[in-house]
């Protein structure tokens, strides 16, 4: 039984060219033999959708099919010029190259002489918070592949030249029959390079590149954060046989700081002060990342955990003229190892100031006392 071409592609009879192509592309990828090896049903479906699309994409064939159905192509219909077979070097393979380009192997692609882009490289670098604040220029040494200076990247021994592969005629691909259609594969004679090096360079063994450690200068901008990535174009691994170099990616991490914690552009720190300074008031100095000393006033009666904000004393925002703030949290130290006299004074202070100077704690203990006395009754 003949298939309905529209049903095979899952489209209506009014589908335009764009819809036909999209439907064919989706189904071709689904049933492609490379994705369904040894699956006769997938191969059958693959053949059907190819036959359907080959007919419907051509306006004249489609018009004939819409009018006469499959009879339009039987017994030499339409002058015998519109057969729906897929033999020869064109036909089915050409349809796929039109739709997918190089996905099917790029039969129309020509060899680039085996040149391949070099691999991208990664380099991990750790910087201090001070360096992240101010920025810096760092010198790094990266082990990588560079172009061989003996053969200038060709891979061939000086005085000789690579020869064109006779198996693929320099295309790097060969066409192989697979059932009712032909597909393209990487040429086994040259591994897809299109050229064969008979006399390889002794220094690079035909690769066109050698391994060597390089020294590079890296500019680290102010305001970088943990995980910031810097790309150095063309500083990666050298390309194969004269191909373009890859890129080098610097991945930055910021060391934990002894005093400051970071949250975006803002910095946080804790400053210990004495109990008397918190009660009577005073001041202290804090060193900031810009190298200055900033004096902070502590008002009398400052409570533990009180936070002070120093505007513009945080981290710069990467590539912006904006700076975060520094938040200082007060950490009141409780005195230890008191002398007899100190203890006496504190006990006297407690008796004099319990109600007047500590209303929160006095009120809490008063309510607790009343609560438990009520339970006892």
Swiss-Prot record:
<feature type="domain" description="J">
    <location>
        <begin position="4"/>
        <end position="69"/>
    </location>
</feature>
<dbReference type="GO" id="GO:0005524">
    <property type="term" value="F:ATP binding"/>
</dbReference>
<dbReference type="InterPro" id="IPR012724">
    <property type="entry name" value="DnaJ"/>
</dbReference>
<comment type="similarity">
    <text>Belongs to the DnaJ family.</text>
</comment>
<keyword id="KW-0677">Repeat</keyword>
<feature type="binding site">
    <location>
        <position position="201"/>
    </location>
    <ligand>
        <name>Zn(2+) 1</name>
    </ligand>
</feature>
<dbReference type="GO" id="GO:0051082">
    <property type="term" value="F:unfolded protein binding"/>
</dbReference>
<feature type="repeat" description="CXXCXGXG motif">
    <location>
        <begin position="201"/>
        <end position="208"/>
    </location>
</feature>
<feature type="repeat" description="CXXCXGXG motif">
    <location>
        <begin position="165"/>
        <end position="172"/>
    </location>
</feature>
<feature type="repeat" description="CXXCXGXG motif">
    <location>
        <begin position="148"/>
        <end position="155"/>
    </location>
</feature>
<dbReference type="GO" id="GO:0042026">
    <property type="term" value="P:protein refolding"/>
</dbReference>
<keyword id="KW-0862">Zinc</keyword>
<dbReference type="GO" id="GO:0008270">
    <property type="term" value="F:zinc ion binding"/>
</dbReference>
<feature type="binding site">
    <location>
        <position position="151"/>
    </location>
    <ligand>
        <name>Zn(2+) 1</name>
    </ligand>
</feature>
<keyword id="KW-0863">Zinc-finger</keyword>
<dbReference type="Pfam" id="PF00226">
    <property type="entry name" value="DnaJ"/>
</dbReference>
<feature type="repeat" description="CXXCXGXG motif">
    <location>
        <begin position="187"/>
        <end position="194"/>
    </location>
</feature>
<keyword id="KW-0479">Metal-binding</keyword>
<dbReference type="Pfam" id="PF01556">
    <property type="entry name" value="DnaJ_C"/>
</dbReference>
<feature type="binding site">
    <location>
        <position position="187"/>
    </location>
    <ligand>
        <name>Zn(2+) 2</name>
    </ligand>
</feature>
<dbReference type="InterPro" id="IPR036410">
    <property type="entry name" value="HSP_DnaJ_Cys-rich_dom_sf"/>
</dbReference>
<feature type="binding site">
    <location>
        <position position="165"/>
    </location>
    <ligand>
        <name>Zn(2+) 2</name>
    </ligand>
</feature>
<feature type="zinc finger region" description="CR-type">
    <location>
        <begin position="135"/>
        <end position="213"/>
    </location>
</feature>
<dbReference type="GO" id="GO:0051085">
    <property type="term" value="P:chaperone cofactor-dependent protein refolding"/>
</dbReference>
<feature type="binding site">
    <location>
        <position position="190"/>
    </location>
    <ligand>
        <name>Zn(2+) 2</name>
    </ligand>
</feature>
<dbReference type="InterPro" id="IPR001305">
    <property type="entry name" value="HSP_DnaJ_Cys-rich_dom"/>
</dbReference>
<keyword id="KW-0346">Stress response</keyword>
<feature type="binding site">
    <location>
        <position position="204"/>
    </location>
    <ligand>
        <name>Zn(2+) 1</name>
    </ligand>
</feature>
<dbReference type="GO" id="GO:0005737">
    <property type="term" value="C:cytoplasm"/>
</dbReference>
<comment type="function">
    <text>Participates actively in the response to hyperosmotic and heat shock by preventing the aggregation of stress-denatured proteins and by disaggregating proteins, also in an autonomous, DnaK-independent fashion. Unfolded proteins bind initially to DnaJ; upon interaction with the DnaJ-bound protein, DnaK hydrolyzes its bound ATP, resulting in the formation of a stable complex. GrpE releases ADP from DnaK; ATP binding to DnaK triggers the release of the substrate protein, thus completing the reaction cycle.</text>
</comment>
<feature type="binding site">
    <location>
        <position position="148"/>
    </location>
    <ligand>
        <name>Zn(2+) 1</name>
    </ligand>
</feature>
<dbReference type="InterPro" id="IPR008971">
    <property type="entry name" value="HSP40/DnaJ_pept-bd"/>
</dbReference>
<dbReference type="InterPro" id="IPR036869">
    <property type="entry name" value="J_dom_sf"/>
</dbReference>
<dbReference type="GO" id="GO:0006260">
    <property type="term" value="P:DNA replication"/>
</dbReference>
<dbReference type="InterPro" id="IPR001623">
    <property type="entry name" value="DnaJ_domain"/>
</dbReference>
<dbReference type="InterPro" id="IPR002939">
    <property type="entry name" value="DnaJ_C"/>
</dbReference>
<dbReference type="GO" id="GO:0009408">
    <property type="term" value="P:response to heat"/>
</dbReference>
<keyword id="KW-0235">DNA replication</keyword>
<feature type="binding site">
    <location>
        <position position="168"/>
    </location>
    <ligand>
        <name>Zn(2+) 2</name>
    </ligand>
</feature>
<dbReference type="Pfam" id="PF00684">
    <property type="entry name" value="DnaJ_CXXCXGXG"/>
</dbReference>
<keyword id="KW-0143">Chaperone</keyword>
<comment type="subunit">
    <text>Homodimer.</text>
</comment>
